[in-house]
Amino acid sequence: MKFELGHCLLNERLMEAGKSAEWLAKELLFKPERFYDFMENKRVMPLKIAISIADSIGCDVRALYELIPSDIEVKGD
């Protein structure tokens, strides 16, 4: 099944973990602004960063975004 990415849920996952974007930035050696861009849907997280974030806050990588099933069929596969 194909999915489209909905809204970023990083802020919600951070709140559940009792952590802040500043904490995450220090943990992963990034500027906090990068995480704010993800949270405000200005940028999409690269998979490598999403995996690191999920590991740091103890959630599944798929929990970082709303996943919207796509109705589009891929032909020729």
What residue ranges belong to the model's regions?
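A short, Lys/Arg-rich alpha-helix, primarily the initiator
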Residues: 1-19
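A detector for short, charged/polar N-terminal pre-domain segments
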Residues: 1-5, 36, 72
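Residues in the helix-turn-helix
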Residues: 23, 34, 63
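Short alpha-helical "recognition helix" segments of helix-turn-helix
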Residues: 24-25, 53
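Recognition helix of helix-turn-helix/homeodomain-like DNA-binding domains
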Residues: 29-44
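Short, basic-rich loop-to-helix N-cap that marks the start of a DNA-contacting helix
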Residues: 42-55
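Short, charged recognition helix plus adjacent turn
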Residues: 55, 65-77
